[in-house]
Amino acid sequence: MDVEVNYSHAYLLAEDDDCYPDGMLDDSPTHPVGIIRVEKGIAFLITGLHTGTVSFTVAVADQDPGADLEGYEDIVEISFESPSAYISLYEAGGAGVHGIPSLSAGPGTYRFRYHARGMDAAREENFSDVVIDHYLLQIWPALHSDPVVLKSTSSYFRYWLSAG
């Protein structure tokens, strides 16, 4: 799906959470992953493009679908606590809302694996209505575990990783 971003982000909200994030959520203090930050019912997804159109794919599965290590430059994982089986992808500022398949195990703990491709090229362009960067968010039920960086290639990802 094409998603409009402003200020290099989009976010997920659980259906019963009507509060948009006030600003950037904090990264995990013990295991930073840079480009995704979570609190209960909210996930803040950082993109390379500052303003314009990015490509998002969200895949909800019953079990770990496996990372796409060849197709993406940067890949991170983090646990997410959802108070609802229903979440949506919101464009920055709530301008647009994209439905996502319901979470297979209902409310509970899930693993998010966030893949990114083209962040450096998108950051150089900064503004674009043509898709430059692509994102895949895989979601499946899992016990809580520490955040982890599976693959780190882009300099923009490394910037966010060090920004904490």
What are these regions (language model features)?
Residues 47-49, 60-64, 80-84, 91-93, ...:
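Generic secondary-structure microfeatures
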